[in-house]
UniProtKB/Swiss-Prot annotation:
Its EC number is 6.3.1.21. Keywords: ATP-binding, Ligase, Magnesium, Metal-binding, Nucleotide-binding, Purine biosynthesis. SUPFAM superfamilies: Glutathione synthetase ATP-binding domain-like, PreATP-grasp domain, Rudiment single hybrid motif. N(1)-(5-phospho-beta-D-ribosyl)glycinamide binds at residues 22-23, 82, 286, 355, 362-363. Pathway: Purine metabolism; IMP biosynthesis via de novo pathway; N(2)-formyl-N(1)-(5-phospho-D-ribosyl)glycinamide from N(1)-(5-phospho-D-ribosyl)glycinamide (formate route): step 1/1. It comes from Shigella dysenteriae serotype 1 (strain Sd197). Mg(2+) binds at residues 267, 279. This is Formate-dependent phosphoribosylglycinamide formyltransferase. It comes from the Bacteria. GO terms for cellular component: cytosol.
Length: 392
């Protein structure tokens, strides 16, 4: 039996978000729908989820002592990481002391580091992956590239949004690629992964829910990446029945091996009927924002339902849908959005995240659309995103 208290009362059920960006904001809103008390934590003030939380705190989430202090102050029943850059060793300690980390501290630690999740997938679970080598010095990095061959990709083992990544075509790029990887890691200079290039037809995110009533799958989400970040996503991505079956089997093995209840974003390469594991996030995925319009239960609603111990039952997908990011480039601490009236309409929505500032290029919103076909949905979403004029 799941017992939920009422927010701001003595018996409240408390959820602490570690990371309060646009994904955390939607998780907070879903918690609010169930009367759950929300505490939003991030490294900067006025982060999106803080706008819809009961309380908020600004800390360095890589500082384990600071993390412990805020947890001891708020006494959450659930700790919900939204990002990778967290003191995961402290999360493991807190979990050992009886706190509930979503989906579990081990999953958060393994997926924070590309080495942890790659070794789990390729070596323990024997899943198909790209060829790879790990290196912690420039000389070993050069040896790894020689072993993998050209072209290849180098990434810091701890980074996100394409930071520190280089597509290497020749030996002339090696020195610069190593230096860039050292600058782009979340925890500073360190270890890298060198990966062989996988030939694939498309990439998908298979949003996979591990819940009290079993493992559930959303329809596959296709997406287009640019500079390491997604630009558009769509659902459903068409693929063969055999490829879908293989994708679901890989995703099932990964989420059960990681453990815990919640939604996982399992990233896969698809080539014909073949499916290759890429990465996994133990939390809602940015490409999954399309589910805000494409499903009866968004990825955020599914995540909350799962980690609270509630059954999912089933997931209804409404048909072709797409998302397109609103990604301006400017510098401002007083952003405004003009021409919004032309970005909404029948089966056409936007979400503006409420980020407090921008300095360069930053994702500030997303357009969402449905249509008779995926192609039309993508075009509608892209057009709507382009209608929003960001000023500051």
């Amino acid at each position: 039996m799941t017992l939920l208290g009422t927010a701001l009362r003595p018996a409240a059920t408390r959820v602490m978000l570690l990371g309060s960006g646009e994904l955390g904001k939607e998780v907070a809103i879903e918690c609010q729908r169930l009367g759950v008390e929300v505490i939003a934590v991030d490294r900067y003030a006025d982060a999106p989820a803080m706008h819809v939380a009961h309380r908020s705190h600004v800390i360095n989430m890589l500082d384990g002592d600071a993390l412990r202090r805020v947890v001891e102050l708020e006494k959450p029943h659930y700790i919900v990481p939204e990002i990778e850059a967290i003191a995961t060793d402290m999360l493991i300690q807190l979990e050992e002391e009886g706190l509930n980390v979503v989906p579990c501290a081990r999953a958060t630690k393994l997926t924070m580091n590309r080495e942890g999740i790659r070794r789990l997938a390729a070596e323990e679970l024997q899943l198909p992956t790209s060829t790879y080598r790990f290196s912690d010095s420039e000389s070993l990095f050069r040896e790894a590239v020689a072993a993998i061959g050209y072209p290849c990709i180098v990434k810091p083992v701890m980074s996100s949004s394409g930071k520190g990544q280089t597509f290497i075509r020749s030996a002339e790029q090696l020195a610069q690629a190593w230096e860039y990887a050292q600058q782009g890691g979340r925890a500073g200079a360190g270890r890298v992964i060198v990966e062989g290039v996988v030939k694939f037809d498309f990439e998908i995110t298979l949003l996979t829910v591990s819940a009290v009533d079993g493992v559930h799958f959303c329809a596959p989400v296709g997406h287009r990446q640019e500079d390491g970040d997604y630009r558009e996503s769509w659902q459903p991505q068409q693929m063969s029945p055999l490829a879908l079956e293989r994708a679901q089997e890989i995703a099932r093995k990964v989420v059960l091996a990681l453990g815990g209840y919640g939604l996982f974003g399992v990233e896969l390469f698809v080539c014909g009927d073949e499916v290759i594991f890429s990465e996994v996030s133990p939390r809602p995925h940015d490409t999954g924002m399309v589910t805000l319009i494409s499903q009866d239960l968004s990825e955020f609603a599914l995540h909350v339902r799962a980690f609270l111990g509630l059954p999912v039952g089933g997931i209804r997908q409404y048909g072709p849908a797409a998302s397109a990011v609103i990604l301006p480039q400017l510098t401002s601490q007083n952003v405004t959005f003009d021409n919004v009236q032309n970005a909404v309409g029948a089966d056409l929505q936007i979400r503006l995240f409420g980020k407090p500032e921008i300095d360069g290029s930053r994702r500030l919103g997303v357009a969402l659309a449905t249509a008779e076909s995926v192609v039309d949905a993508i075009e509608r979403a892209k057009h709507a995103a382009g209608q929003v004029k960001v000023q500051g």
